From Swiss-Prot:
It comes from Drosophila funebris. Residues 896-906 have a biased composition (Basic residues). It is an enzyme of class 2 (transferase). Keywords: Nucleotidyltransferase, RNA-directed DNA polymerase, Transferase, Transposable element. This is RNA-directed DNA polymerase from mobile element jockey. GO terms for molecular function: RNA-directed DNA polymerase activity. PROSITE patterns: RT_POL. Residues 483-757 form the Reverse transcriptase domain. Pfam families: Exo_endo_phos, RVT_1.
Length: 916
């Protein structure tokens, strides 16, 4: 039996991006598990893509393309990145690899020359790596111990540290550096420093491959790596679907009686057991090995060049003949060109076959998806003690402990109020009609709308499998769902949510607070939540209770309508020479800190007894665990909050905040002089008056009422993130306002619902921000949109229209009122983009390019979006939004209309606005 081995490569390259294709061949040919690369010459933001591998870089502190180190590890092996070390005298990238005997640290070390090292520095360096490590790299240290004819000062110090400590040197004894200067003697600069391993378990050899003045080393560590658990679902790909359906139809018994809570849990367990047995019986007999299918197939010319270059490299190492070194350089350059041509040919073939239809599996959208979402880096994080999480298990536990404290309600409410809420929850219900029963047609419609590519919960039952269930199984689910509605019991069979952490945009990946949780909930539980939600939303009490100014989580309500309300209110103030004072509130951990008793207290007066009992049961005993890098944390309990990722959570949050103060909280102004605008937890409050003090006093009056409400219901307001903006054309600003005794920062602009609102509503800063984000997005997609690549022009235009342009035109029905000077910046962006993707010559007019590519001009686009938007407003279900429509504006009485004083546009003017 072959002993399990971890293959570790070591190479000093002087520029990883240039030789990535040759490195990819090296990894495939030698089946490398971990590759340590020094002098990678990578800069912040640069990345290389090696299929099947994860890369971790450390950059030179200067930010230039020099020095640096990289660790390349097979993605299927369980590992944890460690915090990189980057100073002028050392750059170290290292990971912790999981083996059957415990973790081992593998480090890529680069120590630049001309830096003086003393013994204490080496000892501190190795102490950071721990008790069990293999640190390979270019130490720029010479000594006879690892194959040099003479020793340098740094080599003597390192030899002394190794000789007097527990460390050992793993080297071939042969030179690894062959300078291009024939006057410089070959030397052994690349080797491994090992700690915690018997040297009999390690082998090393020199490979005369790869194009560099350093030869790579290949070490074999006799140990068993631990692989990450594969992503799986209940029904395997390639399963016999007909056999799966037949087994379910035959073994599901519809005559079972479900009376109480235990019967419901037993019925669900029985259903899942039958599903598992059916999945096992229908599983394919042979499953393809994905790793083996990804082995590179080398063309004959590439294979022959590699063999010849390897042979010449050995001959040069043996003789040191300068003429042989020249032949080797020519072969290396030719191999580099052949590999680049091969890579470009593969890219051209890929681009030629991209399309948007189902025959290519929507390949164009799949390849552009990575540019639409921010990838969460696999980074080391700090623990509460200020140290670093060394393993994936530690990372998941730190995340879980952080969330456990986060999922606890605050204790601001007075004791008398808390007692009143508790007593109210104990009072009995009055008699009420039962909820509408679930029907087979309702379940079928719900199943048909499930997205098949959603990740499953911990029960591994995904939406794709649910969509394949036969009618017999769906009828069984109908029976279970109706029993749940009748009994008022949310099943506890699988209450544990699997949480993954996603990095917030623009945050540091090293801090726990920089991540937000997303729950992977069982699919059947989500179906049940959807059925409950449908019955909650049909309740007139609920629809009346949620205020009209709450536009979040509501059908036919979007962010443009709420932005329009805020902008329209401020514009009216500008036209009347008024001051519009505004406050944008930030609720700290709004969804995670929802006080459950307070929510149940409010829901009890709105829901039927059965639905209330279901919601109450929904909270009881909820648990979660955090998953990262294939490891799962211990199970923790949830004491507060609405689960992010659940179906019921958003509506329950709206019910919890339904009684927040409205315009009536302000007594000093008329109702029309106060605006409340909320979208989920984004809250904007505006007051206007010709008197700056009066507007500020009214705003302060509302903030005092809101703070009182927040304390009463255990809601925390983050005063440091709240902002106070005065919308006016005058120079003066409103006096400061406070909340909970903290003075809010006064700014001249604020980003609300994705749009930057400046004090004069010119939208200049917003359009400048759009320019930066547009250019960043285009830079990432340059290889797809270049004029001379093989992607068809039609597909390039589709990418622009569907991926790039929506970021420009978001909320243009609101910010389209900006001056022509600012909107021309958007026109220039589109013109340059279309000229780039079409390769049109300089003398061709932009309007002709837009016409040929069937891309509307900016002015036409604004009018088109505004027309559809105002048609939607005229029939909007919310009266607050209908007031913004053109029909409502025209039918309003002359006295209620705002007299136009300024030479500027309003959103309703965009229907007829012309941009030349």
């Amino acid at each position: 039996m072959t002993q399990p081995t971890i293959k570790i490569g070591l190479w000093m390259h002087r520029g990883l991006t240039r030789g990535s294709e040759e490195l990819r061949l090296f990894l495939s040919v030698h089946n490398i598990d971990v590759m340590l690369v020094t002098e990678s010459h990578m800069r912040e933001g640069q990345r290389i893509f090696l299929p099947g591998y994860s890369t971790y870089h450390v950059f030179h502190p200067s930010g230039n393309s020099r020095g640096g180190a990289s660790v390349i590890v097979r993605s299927s092996i369980s590992h944890s990145p460690q915090p990189p070390i980057s100073t002028n005298d050392r750059q170290i990238a290292y990971i912790q690899l999981q083996t059957a005997e415990g973790p081992v640290v593998l480090a890529a070390v680069y120590l630049p020359p001309r830096e003086r090292w003393i013994r204490a520095e080496f000892e501190s360096l190795f102490a950071v790596l721990g008790n069990k490590f293999i640190a390979g790299g270019d130490y720029n240290a010479k000594h006879a111990w690892w194959g040099n004819s003479r020793a340098c000062a740094r080599g003597k110090v390192l030899q002394e540290v190794v000789a007097n400590g527990q460390y050992q040197i793993l080297a071939t004894g042969e030179p690894t550096f062959y300078s291009y200067n024939p006057l410089v003697s070959p030397s052994a600069l690349d080797f491994f420093v090992v700690n915690g391993y018997d040297m009999r378990r390690l082998n090393v050899q020199t490979l005369h491959e790869l194009s560099s003045d350093h030869t790579p080393l290949l070490a074999d560590l006799h140990a068993m790596p631990i692989n990450k658990p594969p992503r799986s679902c209940l029904l395997a790909r390639g399963a016999d679907i007909e056999r799966f359906k037949a087994y379910l139809t035959q073994h599901i018994d519809l005559s079972v009686g479900i009376q109480g809570t235990d019967d419901i849990d037993n019925a669900i367990d029985s259903f899942m057991d039958i599903l598992k047995r059916a999945a096992i019986r229908s599983a394919p007999s042979h499953q393809q090995n994905v790793e083996s299918s990804r082995q590179l197939q080398l063309p004959p010319i590439v294979a022959s060049l590699i063999r010849l270059k390897r042979k010449v490299r050995r001959e040069y190492a043996r003789t040191g003949d300068a003429r042989i070194q020249q032949i080797h350089s020519r072969l290396a350059n030719r191999l580099h060109k052949v590999l680049n041509r091969r890579k470009q040919s593969q890219i051209d073939n890929l681009l030629e076959n991209l399309d948007t239809d189902g025959s290519t599996n929507f390949s164009l959208w799949r390849i552009t998806k990575r540019y639409k979402t921010q990838a969460t880096p696999n980074s080391a994080i700090r623990n509460p003690a200020g140290g670093w999480c060394r393993t994936s298990r530690e990372k998941t536990e730190v995340f879980a402990n952080h969330l456990e404290q986060r999922f606890k309600a605050l204790a601001f409410a007075p004791e008398s109020h808390s007692l009143m809420v508790a007593e109210s929850l104990q009072t009995p219900f009055q008699m009420a009609l039962p909820a509408d029963p679930v029907t087979l047609e309702e379940v079928k419609e719900l199943v048909s709308k499930l997205k098949p590519k959603k990740a499953p919960g911990e029960d591994l039952l995904d939406n794709r499998t649910i969509r394949l269930l036969p009618d017999q199984a769906l009828l069984y689910l109908v029976l279970i769902f109706n029993s749940i509605l009748r009994v008022g019991y949310f099943p506890k069979a699988r209450p544990t949510a699997s949480i993954i952490m996603i990095l917030k945009p623009g945050k540091q990946p090293l801090d726990v607070d920089s991540y937000r949780p997303t729950s992977l909930l069982p699919s059947l539980g989500k179906m049940l939540e959807r059925l409950i939600l449908n019955r909650i939303l049909t309740s007139e009490e609920v629809t009346r209770a949620i205020p009209k100014f709450q536009f979040g989580f509501r059908l036919q309500h979007g962010t443009p309508e709420q932005l329009h309300r805020v902008v329209n209110f401020a514009l009216e103030a500008l036209e009347k020479k008024e001051y519009a004072g505004s406050c944008f509130l930030d609720i700290q951990q709004a969804f995670d800190r929802v006080w459950h008793p307070g929510l149940l207290y409010k829901a009890k007066s709105l829901l039927s007894p059965q639905l209330f009992q279901l919601i109450k049961s929904f909270w009881e005993g909820r648990k979660f665990s955090v998953t990262a890098d294939g490891c799962r944390s211990s199970v923790k309990f949830i004491e507060a909050g609405v689960p992010q990722g659940s179906v019921l959570g958003p509506t329950l949050y709206s019910i919890f905040t339904a009684d927040m103060p409205n315009q009536n909280a302000v007594t000093g102004l008329a109702e029309g002089e106060v605006l409340i605008a909320t979208y989920a937890d984004d809250i904007a409050v505006l007051t206007k008056s010709t008197c700056i003090v009066e507007a500020t006093d009214a705003l302060q009056e509302y903030l005092d009422a809101f703070q009182e409400w927040a304390v009463k219901w255990n809601v925390s307001i983050n005063a440091g993130k709240c902002a106070n903006v005065t919308f006016t054309n005058a120079i003066r600003d409103c006096p400061g306002v406070t909340i909970n005794g903290s003075l809010l920062s006064h700014t001249h602009e604020y980003k609300y619902l994705g749009v930057i609102l400046d004090r004069s509503l010119t939208f200049r800063r917003h359009i400048t921000s759009l320019q930066h984000s547009f250019r960043t997005r285009i830079t990432k997609m340059n290889w797809l949109l270049a004029a001379r690549n093989k992607l068809s022009l039609d597909n390039k235009v589709k990418i622009y229209k569907c991926i790039v342009a929506p970021g420009l035109f978001y909320a243009i029905q609101v910010y389209g009122i900006a001056a022509r000077t600012h909107l021309n910046k958007i026109r220039v962006l589109q013109a340059k983009m279309l000229r780039k993707i079409s390769g049109a010559p300089w003398y061709m007019r932009t309007r002709d390019i837009e016409c040929d590519l069937k891309v509307p001009k900016i002015g036409d686009k604004i009018r088109e979006v505004a027309k559809k938007y105002h048609e939607r407003l005229d029939s909007h279900p919310n009266s607050l939004a209908r007031r913004l429509g053109v029909a409502a504006q025209r039918s309003a009485s002359p006295r209620s209309r705002v007299r136009r004083r300024l030479k500027r546009h309003h959103p309703q003017d965009l229907l007829d606005r012309a941009l030349t």
